[in-house]
Amino acid sequence: MTTTMFSSLARQGGRLWALVLAAALALTMAAIGPADAHGEKSQAAFLRMRTLNWYDLKWSKTNVTVNEEYEITGKLYIMNAWPAAIEVPNQCFLNTGQPGAMAARLGVWVGGQFTPRSMKLEVGKTYAFRVLLKARRPGHWHTHVQLSVKTGGPIPGPGQYIDIKGNFSDYRDDVKLLNGTTVNIETYGQASIYLWHLVWIIAGIAWILYWFNKRGFVGRFAWVASGKAEELITPQERIVGALSLLAVLLVVIIFYAITVSNYPNTIPLQAGDFHNIQALENEVNSGPITIKYVNGTYKVPGRELLANFKITNNGKEPLRIGEFSTAGLRFLNPDVFTSKVAYPDYLLADRGLSLSDNSPIAPGETKDIAVTVQDARWDTERLSGLAYDVDSSFAGVLFFFSPSGARYPMEVTGPVIPTFMPV
């Protein structure tokens, strides 16, 4: 009797403990706030540094109201350092990366061509792009432009916060149909969508309840285990199954015919890729400069990339190195950029670039220059992971500037030796 009493108390204590754990879990879940993170940081450093280089990005507006249009423009360079682990962008799609449908994408243009579908871009070429958006859902949203590459997935570019004011209920997305009528596709056909979802949910629930009320999983397992698998489904149940299949087929066929009759003029979803996208001329690697990467190191504790170059100025004006751009980050030489640059702060190191010789490279002159790129953003944006890549290589674009205002972007890439001890 004492054993029984202790067993009962143990069971009651276990139940109470389980109840306390469940209540504590519920309380912690109630205290959870919305998630807020930059997902591009999770991508490998080599993927972001050696695939694409985004520059001259501009967000036309960062404060808009619902239904207001805004755009993202810029230039996209397909790096020659493209890694072998990822298929080259023979099939890719320019899109935006944003937390849900906070804005509607009205159009995308690459190389001056409207590109609503996938396209082919060439390695070593630079393309101008424009993405037109329409504010939809109020909030404070982080918006990227990104290129989705077959087998490589989405490769996001720099992001900017967009503040959308107003009421979501005021949003409209009017489209003119082939018959000349204009509809708001935000709400068009919503009643039919809800109706058909409800019909099939009810049908599915009825189907599940019918079979579960018969025997359930455990009962059917017992029948199979006892050697009665052939008797598990009765003739009546076979008839019910056949009639259910027939009813589903009839509903689909009949209402499909009704829909085709009501909407005779339709266009199928479009397929196919765009080719021969016009690339920009006189952009990356087109300047009067010969640049050779000699060697380099990456100091992990100091978040510092040190790269040595041999640079020859083949032009008629002196040139200065003003910027290093990689993975959306911009490291600036403060002696060249003397005023504030309009760019997202978390991606801008306005004093992140320094040179062993900051004097201009004269026409016809060859210089050995050590370029130091140092900033905490190497770590906060998780680019320090290049020290752990299988080939430990960096890539980016160096921007050279002349007194007349000319700018010459040049791709640089090469292996670096990681240093893990402070020097």
Set out the residue ranges of the language-model regions:
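Juxtamembrane interface at the cytosolic side of transmembrane helices
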Residues: 202-244
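Short, aromatic-rich amphipathic segments at membrane interfaces
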Residues: 161-196
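C-terminal soluble domains/tails of integral membrane proteins
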Residues: 261-423
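N-terminal edge beta-strand
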Residues: 42-71, 284-293
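Short beta-strand and strand-turn-strand segments in soluble, beta-rich domains
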Residues: 53-54, 99-116, 338-355
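Internal/C-terminal transmembrane anchor helices
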Residues: 233-263
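Membrane-proximal low-complexity regions enriched in glycine and acidic/polar residues
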Residues: 64-157
